[in-house]
Design a protein with these regions (language model features):
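Bacterial peptidoglycan biogenesis and beta-lactam-recognition machinery
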Residues: 2-3, 404
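Long, compositionally biased intrinsically disordered regions
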Residues: 183, 196-284, 422, 435-539, ...
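Short intrinsically disordered coil segments
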Residues: 52-57, 113, 226-232, 396-397, ...
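M16 family metallopeptidases and their MPP-like homologs
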Residues: 34-44, 71-186, 206-216, 222, ...
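His/Glu-based metal-binding/catalytic segments typifying zinc-dependent metallopeptidases
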Residues: 4-67, 152-171, 175, 237-334, ...
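Short alpha-helical segments and helix-capping/turn motifs at coil-helix boundaries
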Residues: 19-24, 180-181, 191-200, 293-296, ...
Length: 724
């Protein structure tokens, strides 16, 4: 059979299409400054390999880079508080979009006029070549490094190949053989390439649209009423026999969902044997050195002359009331002016000379004494060996010379954080629900919540709302927090490279340490004050995220590797069948940590009380767990698959440093792996009391639809809007 799989080209529009659509908000959410404006243009085809990369670099210059000209022009005119972009390059006719969030519908004309004014200026007067060069280096470094985290490189290369191969069977490699294209782009940077692209694809191109997405209260109820009316009309049009057939089909579907697949069919699927699996866990690379009296944890690995450097500063001197500022620092450092560079200049220098510098806050729990945890502020960079002096110089400038008193820039950053957090909470409510529930009993989760969770959102929302009255305090507290963190006493270094890289680190690290501040300050006293409240956060979402949490160690139970197997069993059997297949949720997850913290959570779930009941019955399922020997082996193999995800040198270094900070010994990892490989039905059933203990503690948090939560309000002690 010959199938015509060709995708037809869409005809271009004669003029820019303009449309207005609506999205639902609750009564608690504002209508003002809550519109999305999107400017969209079709740009060539996915088979143009030069355009494929050039548009990514152009996007970097226009919107993505800190201080990008087009983004800054929109923000300066008050058209949205968060400007972002997207390049959909995996379709035959790629689409480039510029989006203003938190705008007004009345700003549509100003939005388009500002975009086109900036584009005309760049097309006429030239692109910022240094920023374009930074963008090229940023993407080329990423391409050469090919760091895809836990995803196999082969898979990611294949997905890139599909961006062209889908549309021309003779062109599978044009986007994975990109080095020549990067070289060509560097050559044409001074020949007007990007100015021509702006003129051709963004200014003179009518194949585009302007979309306004406007908030509307009551829209969800309108749609629900329309759907109910449509279904009622359809039902009334059916005969008695047709109605009975639908009932019978539904019953048949439920029976099919409950019926296991025939064993003979399952056994046709090839499967590994346990004897095929390596019994030793992955090696830890921990070689403790000292440079200028600072501990340097060397992860001795071949990195192809790329050094992965992390400066980890213990936040032990930061008092509880300043911990939210530790989270804020990670969004401020590197994105504000310093005494030597404006923040766009700083970004250009970093991306031209390195693979980037990033900062973040992290929490490590001791693997032997679970009452101990460490809050660390991490400054990370990746560079070629010869650029180590440069990256340390930039790190010093960022942590010591940032101008926190720049009120305009600080306001922009806080508004952007708020916007991004609200977007993330909408699509990832399960993380909000899980962390909020666990923060009620787990110290490490409590402080994670302060640094990046809902408590941090509350801090950011207040800082955004009351910025004018708080701005001096915000700047002063950022300075104070930085001073308490960035000292020699607090520093431990993680360094992933070969011995030759370590040798090249000695001199610049010695010079860096010599310039570190020394501060005589007592360690802060942490005060964990948990408040147990069954909480629901309401939004206009049509789905729920239901989290049920607890801690099995509180009843004296110990961690075992069999819990890792149970996680897989839940993911592919109990929770999968009940929450996803029968319940209709998009996903379900669980976790059992070494410190006893336990969670079960649903993802994009149409249900609420029903899912909570499924979580409550989990211990009984474990108590009665019974599968064939073959299925037990499958669960073990699935567990090992999660433990043995591909790791590049950078990932191995991160894992090893985490083990060092948490005092995790190789023997612990080996014991855990043996417990996984030796897991049996009996060892799984023995976990029932652990699950029962955790669930019975009754820590519940739900993020979801306002009406659905109100229907089940008796389940909660506190109900609040998700967005403040």
């Amino acid at each position: 059979m010959q199938i015509d799989a060709d995708i037809a080209m869409q005809k271009p529009f004669n003029i820019l299409k303009k449309e207005t659509h609506y999205y639902a908000v609750t009564e608690d959410e504002p209508l003002e400054n809550n519109t999305y404006l999107s400017y969209n243009k079709v740009v060539g085809t996915a088979l143009d390999k030069k355009l494929y990369l050039a548009m990514q670099i152009l996007d970097y210059v226009l919107v993505m880079a800190p201080g990008a000209k087009l983004k800054q022009a929109l923000i300066d005119k008050g058209i949205g508080t968060d400007i972002y972009s997207s390049l959909e390059s995996s379709v035959l006719q790629p689409v480039y979009s510029i989006v203003a969030k938190n705008a007004e519908e009345s700003q549509k004309k100003a939005f388009v006029d500002t975009i086109e004014e900036v584009l005309r200026d760049i097309a006429k007067n030239g692109i910022d070549k240094r920023m374009a060069l930074a963008g090229m280096n940023y993407y080329e470094f990423k391409f050469r490094e090919a760091d895809y985290g836990a995803y196999p490189k082969g898979l990611m290369y294949y997905l890139t190949m599909m961006d062209s191969w889908l549309y021309d069977e003779n062109e599978p490699f044009i986007h994975v053989e990109a080095l020549d294209t990067f070289a060509q782009l560097r050559k044409e940077l001074d020949e007007g390439l990007f100015e021509e692209l702006i003129q051709k694809y963004l200014l003179d191109n009518s194949h585009g649209s302007l979309i306004a997405l406007v908030p509307k209260r009551g829209l969800e109820e309108e749609k629900a009423a329309e759907e109910a009316k449509r279904l009622e009309t359809y039902k009334n049009s059916l005969s008695k026999e047709e109605l009975e057939a639908i009932v019978a089909d539904t019953a048949a579907l439920k029976a099919y969902q409950d019926e296991p697949s025939p064993q003979e069919e399952l056994e046709r699927i090839p499967m590994l044997k346990l004897s095929d699996i390596e019994r030793e866990p992955a090696k830890l690379y921990i070689d403790k050195k000292s440079i200028a009296d600072v501990d340097v944890i060397h992860h001795n690995l071949f990195t192809n002359q790329i050094a992965y450097l992390m400066l980890a500063f213990d936040c032990k001197k930061v008092p509880d009331e300043l911990l939210p500022y530790v989270g804020l620092l990670s969004s401020v450092l590197g994105l504000m002016d310093t005494h030597k560079h404006t923040y766009p200049e700083l970004t250009n220098e970093i991306n031209i000379n390195s693979g980037g510098i990033a900062t973040d806050a992290a929490i490590y729990t001791d693997s032997k004494d679970f009452s101990k945890y460490t809050v660390m502020y991490e400054v990370k960079g990746k560079v070629l060996y010869e650029k180590l002096p440069f990256v340390l110089e930039m790190m010093h400038e960022i942590i010591y010379e940032t101008k926190f008193e720049d009120e305009k820039r600080l306001r922009e950053i806080i508004a952007r954080i708020k916007s991004r957090m609200e977007s993330n909470m909408t699509g990832s409510g399960h993380t909000v629900a899980m962390l909020s529930a666990m923060a009620q009993f787990s110290p490490s989760s409590y402080y994670s919540d302060i640094l990046r969770g809902y408590q941090y959102y509350e801090f950011i929302e207040k800082a955004d709302r009351d910025f004018d009255s708080m701005k001096e305090m915000l700047a002063e507290n950022l300075k104070r927090t930085a001073a308490l963190i960035f000292t020699k006493e607090n520093l431990t270094v993680s360094f992933t490279a070969g011995d030759d890289g370590l040798e090249l680190l000695q001199k610049p690290m010695t010079e860096f340490v010599a310039k570190l501040a020394q501060l005589q300050e007592k360690d802060a006293v942490r005060t964990f004050r948990p408040v147990k409240e069954k909480t629901a956060y309401t939004s206009s979402s049509q789905v729920q995220y239901v989290a049920r949490c607890g801690n099995y160690r509180k009843a004296g139970y110990e961690y075992t590797g069999a819990l890792k197997v149970l996680k897989i069993i839940f993911s592919y059997d109990y929770l999968w069948l009940n929450v996803r297949v029968k319940g209709g949720a998009y996903g379900c997850m669980s976790g059992f940590y070494r410190n006893g913290d336990t969670y079960m959570v649903s993802y994009r779930d149409p249900n609420l009380a029903e899912t909570n009941t499924i979580f409550e019955q989990a211990a009984e399922y474990v108590r009665r767990f019974d599968v064939s020997e073959r299925d037990m082996v499958k669960f073990i193999i699935g567990t090992i698959g999660g433990m043995d995800t591909p790791m590049n040198p950078a990932s191995k270094g991160v894992r090893s440093f985490g083990a060092y900070i948490c005092h995790t010994e190789y023997a612990q990892l080996k014991k855990e792996r043996e417990e996984v490989l030796n897991a049996t039905k009996e060892s799984i059933r023995a976990l029932a009391p652990l699950i029962e203990t955790a669930v019975s503690q009754d820590y519940l948090c739900v993020v979801g639809n306002n009406a659905k939560i109100r229907e089940n309000e008796q389940m909660f002690e506190k109900i609040e809007p998700l967005f403040l």
